[in-house]
């Protein structure tokens, strides 16, 4: 089915069919922030060294399973999805190297959602810069570009990263190792702070810091998706 395009009409969403719409949405989903191949779940130890060869195809689920999930969501009364993706999912291999397979997968997922009567709000998600700094979003090659070794962030106390702290063999919730929702502490840790400072204020605080012939700020902003 082709859903009517929604427009803003005062306090309402109004479709091109003239009807008013109330959107009832669900988040889909948290695991879109990490790779599907290899499994990027945050309870699995990694130093992220293979960040250029990951794949997000299959997040939040394989296309073959999408119909089952979408039909359930419709049956439960939902008509809107907040569908997550990240900069890393699209451009993890390097500058201007876009993962065409992932983009094809993501587009197909959106078309299927439309077939099941689900509107899609695409959330280009980012938390505390990237997976390497305890969150998600930016690809790892940006650290290479500015000369930061993300494999040393945890040891240096520059980031609070679950992949280094969680004991996979022990399993379960581990409040002693990684208390729930403490990823947000990375807003005050150096690795995240350095990257955002370079991104928004590099020309002010370090105007002579050059990356491939450009100021660090200009380099980061020109590459941002």
Language-model segment annotations:
Residues 1-22:
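N-terminal module-boundary/linker segments of secreted carbohydrate-active enzymes
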Residues 20-23, 28-225:
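Active-site mouth of glycoside hydrolases
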């Amino acid at each position: 089915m082709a859903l009517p395009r929604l427009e803003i009409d005062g306090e309402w969403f109004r479709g091109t069919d003239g009807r008013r719409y109330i959107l009832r949405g669900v988040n889909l989903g948290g695991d879109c922030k990490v790779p599907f191949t290899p499994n990027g779940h945050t309870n699995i130890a990694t130093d992220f060294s293979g960040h250029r060869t990951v794949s997000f195809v299959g997040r939040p689920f394989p296309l073959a399973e999408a119909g089952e999930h979408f039909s359930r969501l419709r049956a439960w009364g939902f008509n809107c999805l907040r569908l997550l993706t990240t900069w890393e999912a699209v451009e993890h291999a390097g500058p201007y190297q876009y993962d065409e397979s992932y983009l094809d997968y993501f587009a197909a997922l959106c078309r299927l959602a439309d077939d099941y009567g689900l509107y899609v709000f695409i959330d280009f998600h980012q938390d505390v810069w990237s997976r390497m700094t305890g969150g998600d979003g930016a690809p790892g090659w940006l650290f290479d570009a500015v000369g930061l070794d993300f494999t040393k962030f945890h040891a240096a106390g520059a980031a609070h990263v679950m992949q280094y702290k969680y004991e996979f063999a022990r399993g379960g919730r581990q409040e002693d190792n990684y208390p729930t929702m403490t990823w947000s502490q990375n807003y005050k840790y150096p690795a995240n702070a350095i990257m955002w400072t370079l991104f928004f204020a590099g020309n002010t605080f370090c105007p002579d810091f050059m990356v491939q012939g450009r100021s660090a700020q200009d380099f980061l902003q020109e590459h941002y998706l």
